[in-house]
């Protein structure tokens, strides 16, 4: 069943005498699709076709590269220890990058901020500036992309694996935290279309992402993967991480769309 959660008109805005394209509307656009606009630029936008302006803002956001590596995006614990700076200084450097991006990048960073509140992590849980920066890049890269691929990518993000205990999820000691939040917070909503058995079986399919050397990237360890059969949403097989994403989006398409929409 298709879901329509749009409560307004879908008619294309056409300026006229009763509803003109003016300063108020230009500012409205940039407040909704960014964080405002320099007032000296407003005059130029007043001379633009509003629909062309919207297309331009989306094209810019879609083609914008992620924030470049500040020089420490791939540091491990040893690199941070030998840098001569404490980790708080790196975190503050990252904050400056984020604020500059907010000022300069408009729509893409507006959506990056939005998704950071959806696929949330908390820095104090892992205290790793490189993880935080790569998580930020992950949000930027997927902010206007395919939601299914976004979900696939975010679950393997080092910051997320640390924050929701994915790195502790092993075949001999499964951890259900990420499996639960994948459904409850990220895709379906609390108690909506899944059972505790689905969570338990999903956690088994997500095992194995545990290998980490000196605070470097987290990688898959097949020796810690549960390679037995699992039943998720009524489907049985030797499911793994990618299978979970495929089954979720095949079986729960409308529920996901409705949850994200509202």
Regions picked out by a protein language model, each given a short descriptive name:
Residues 2-17, 25, 29-33:
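Substrate/cofactor-recognition hotspot
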Residues 16-20, 45:
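Extreme N-terminal leader/anchor segments
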